Amino acid sequence: MADTALNANLRKTATKSIVKEIRNNGGIPGVVYGKHVGSMAISVDAKDLKNILGSVTGRNTLINMNINGSKQTVMVKSLQMDPMHQNIRHVDFQQVSENTKIRTVIPVQLVGTPKGVAMGGVIQHDLRSAEIECLPNRIPEAIQVDISGLEIGDTLSVSDLNLPPGVKILDHPHTTVVGLATIKAPEPAGQPEVPPEPAEEAKAKTIEKE
């Protein structure tokens, strides 16, 4: 089911010194958990993991993990990042089964140029990622939305999306995905106050005295 390989090493302890040593040697500490494996503390090579995350499928890549000779199909479930340097400090892997549906998040990509753009329409992309449910081997790289037919004032909602067979989107059907709006022209500035003519100003002062 998975064609991307990743080697992992079991680690029996999780002391600060062991974790620091793993990172200093180019590794990333992590955990694999699932129905059939329980929870296992592991470490993986940082470069190998970054290559997987940088691929087209990214975190939704099905990984054939070799854990000291034991093969498990897993996916990246969560990452703990170093906020200062944006390095991965810890990774959680979830074991998956080819017969069990899972939930994950995939990007929503817009395709085409709306008709209304020529009339001054502006694209408003509201839903940039969507939560889906499907079997692991049916996870699409992205949901592509054809917006070429949109005119000013048109919108597309989750219920309008065309999904691959076996894929269910979990976002609310009425959630707006994309729309074509117009930018309001700035209202003209107020007319500057015109000072009264000298004669009118003098007349006004005379009336005030009376």
Curated annotation (Swiss-Prot):
Asked if the Swiss-Prot or TrEMBL record annotates the protein with the keyword RNA-binding, the reply is yes
Q: Name one Pfam family in it.
A: Ribosomal_TL5_C
Xref: CDD domains = Ribosomal_L25_TL5_CTC
GO cellular component entries? cytosolic large ribosomal subunit
The Basic and acidic residues compositionally biased stretches are: 200-210
Give GO BP annotations, semicolon-separated.
translation
Q: Could you tell me which residues belong to the region Disordered?
A: 185-210
Keyword rRNA-binding among UniProt keywords: yes
Question: What does the record give under GO molecular function?
Answer: 5S rRNA binding; structural constituent of ribosome
| Keywords, comma-separated and alphabetical | Ribonucleoprotein, Ribosomal protein, RNA-binding, rRNA-binding
Q: What does this protein do?
A: This is one of the proteins that binds to the 5S RNA in the ribosome where it forms part of the central protuberance.
Subunit composition?
Part of the 50S ribosomal subunit; part of the 5S rRNA/L5/L18/L25 subcomplex. Contacts the 5S rRNA. Binds to the 5S rRNA independently of L5 and L18.
NCBIfam families referenced in this protein's UniProt entry, alphabetically? bL25_bact_ctc
Assigned protein family: Belongs to the bacterial ribosomal protein bL25 family. CTC subfamily.
Identification of the protein by name? Large ribosomal subunit protein bL25
This chain's source organism reads Desulforamulus reducens (strain ATCC BAA-1160 / DSM 100696 / MI-1) (Desulfotomaculum reducens)
